[in-house]
Structures are given as structure tokens and as C-alpha cells.
Amino acid sequence: MRTWVLATAVAALSVGGARAAVTVFGSDSATQCSKAATDGKSDAASELYCTRALNEDTLMGDDRAGTFVNRGVMKLRRGDFEASHADFDAALALAPKMAEAWVNRGAMWVGERQYQSGLDDLNRALELGVKEPEKAYYDRALAYEGLDNEKAAYFDYQKALELKPNWVLPQHELLRFHVSRPTLPG
């Protein structure tokens, strides 16, 4: 019986987003793919483990979907949005309730400056209970900024920081905001 647990890996893209990898225990290739994604790798050799696992191993259900997510994460780290999109779609076709597939596809959309699509996917990830919601809130804040909704972005950066208090990325983003109260008449 193959088991899987969720883990995360943070990678900075041009949009500065956070990626969530899925740890898969099973075949050697799937395990190596999972480890590479979790360790923040994005090189071709690491991605090859994922491709081998998908092409040669008998992965079922969530393990197969998780391997697509991991390969998509590596592609996303390199800025290969089109290829990562295909992998996230493949994962969602197999496991439509896998929150990590939604959060990563949402990050991909944000990287492509398709902010509304990103927002929709990130909201879905949060609804499904993504394991590290701070990453979804951070990426959603980026989407809100892209949609010129600074107030919502501010609150999502705050929420990301509340969930992970020492995380530098939302701390840095919050430094750009100036919050003031409106002056009331009288």
C-alpha cells in the first residue's frame, strides 16, 4: 500500500510565491521526485525522477497526482508556466480535492499575471484545507495586489504572517504598506 503525506517547499519565483510539494512514498523514482521537490530542487535531473515515476511506475490515485504536483512545482520554480500548468491540471484530474494542486496552480496563474484565475484557485485550496495555508494566503495577497485590491492584499499578508510569525516574505511585503485611519468629521 502506498501512503502519502503532504510537505512543503518554498521557492522564490519572480513573483516571490511559495510552493507546496506533495511527499510521495512508493517507488524509488517517486520518492526521489518527492524529495527533490520538497528540498526545493528544480533541475532537469530531479525532474527526470518524476517523469520516470509517472511513465514507468504503477502509481495510483493520490500518489500519481502528487507526483504530477511535484514535477509541476519543479517546472514552476524554473518559470515554465505552460508545462507546470499541464502537470497541475493532470493532478487535479486525478485528485480534484488535492489542495496542494490548487495552491500551486494558483501560484502559476499569479506568475502568469492571470490574477483572477489565481485568486479562484487559491480560494479553492483554502476551502479544501491546504496543509500550509500561510502559503496560500501569501500567494493570494499577490493576486489581490495584481487586481489592485491593496486592502485585501494587506490582510492576506497579515494572515500569512499570523500563521507563520517569522516568515520573511510577508514581513517584507507588509513594510510597503502604510495604514492610516480616516479622519472623522467633528
Predicted regions and their residues:
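N-terminal leader/linker segments that initiate helical-solenoid repeat arrays
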Residues: 19-59
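Residue-level recognition of tetratricopeptide repeat
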Residues: 64, 98, 132-133, 167
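Register position in tetratricopeptide repeats
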Residues: 77, 111-112, 146, 173-183
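Conserved structural position within tetratricopeptide repeats
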Residues: 52-55, 59, 90-93, 124-127, ...
